Amino acid sequence: MATPNRPWMGLLLLGVLGVLQTPAPTEAALQPNFEEDKFLGRWFTSGLASNSSWFLEKRKVLSMCKSEVAPAADGGLNVTSTFLRKDQCETRTLLLRPAGPPGCYSYTSPHWSSTHEVSVAETDYETYALLYTESVRGPGPDSLMATLYSRTQTPRAEVKEKFTTFARSLGFTEEGIVFLPKTDKCMEVRT
């Protein structure tokens, strides 16, 4: 009996092998022995990676933002971020509440009516931090985001490469990874 479906079977097998070779997104590790007091202070959001539709639509117009991380009264962290939006500086503060081992936090976004879990995956405290955020409850589909925090507005090449490797390990594609352009607006340093 002839096997007219043999070419289709070959394509199907190649497709299955391609799927099997595509790395599945993995959960980010957590910074061992996270020291919250060393994490405090000024950070610049230098890189982002995400699978969310809003990010993919807006990624070309995003720019670097400045964040101040300070202890909160309840033991969590207040993260006050200043960024450029429609040619004006905008500031928002998030309360990160402890949510598990040190370095794990959660916050609720009043804007999106969603809850997010944030993990500090890796940091040297003085130069960079790699964060992983997952939306866990909300009206829309779950979304994932990796963030590169840098203590300066110009992270070193090896820090950028570390972030790219981190983002890829979480399943993000090149299209979903962006290094945010530096801007002079809203970045002034107050003493």
Swiss-Prot record:
Example GO molecular function: prostaglandin-D synthase activity
Keywords per UniProt: Cytoplasm, Disulfide bond, Endoplasmic reticulum, Fatty acid biosynthesis, Fatty acid metabolism, Glycoprotein, Golgi apparatus, Isomerase, Lipid biosynthesis, Lipid metabolism, Mast cell degranulation, Membrane, Nucleus, Prostaglandin biosynthesis, Prostaglandin metabolism, Secreted, Signal, Transport
Entry keyword annotation includes Zinc: no
Keyword Transmembrane recorded: no
Leader peptide range in chain numbering: 1-24
Major localization class: endoplasmic reticulum
Reactions this protein catalyses: prostaglandin H2 = prostaglandin D2
Subcellular location per the Swiss-Prot or TrEMBL entry: Rough endoplasmic reticulum; Nucleus membrane; Golgi apparatus; Cytoplasm, Perinuclear region
E.C. designation(s): 5.3.99.2
Catalytic residues, chain numbering: 65
Residue positions the entry lists as glycosylated: 51, 78
Any one GO CC term of the record: extracellular space
Pfam family, one: Lipocalin
Tissue-specificity statement: In the male reproductive system, it is expressed in the testis and epididymis, and is secreted into the seminal fluid.
Domain notes for this protein: Forms a beta-barrel structure that accommodates hydrophobic ligands in its interior.
PANTHER family the record matches: LIPOCALIN, PROSTAGLANDIN-H2 D-ISOMERASE
Family of the protein in this entry: Belongs to the calycin superfamily. Lipocalin family.
Function: Catalyzes the conversion of PGH2 to PGD2, a prostaglandin involved in smooth muscle contraction/relaxation and a potent inhibitor of platelet aggregation. Involved in a variety of CNS functions, such as sedation, NREM sleep and PGE2-induced allodynia, and may have an anti-apoptotic role in oligodendrocytes. Binds small non-substrate lipophilic molecules, including biliverdin, bilirubin, retinal, retinoic acid and thyroid hormone, and may act as a scavenger for harmful hydrophobic molecules and as a secretory retinoid and thyroid hormone transporter.
Protein name: Prostaglandin-H2 D-isomerase
Source organism phylogeny: Eukaryota, Metazoa, Chordata, Craniata, Vertebrata
Gene coding for it: PTGDS
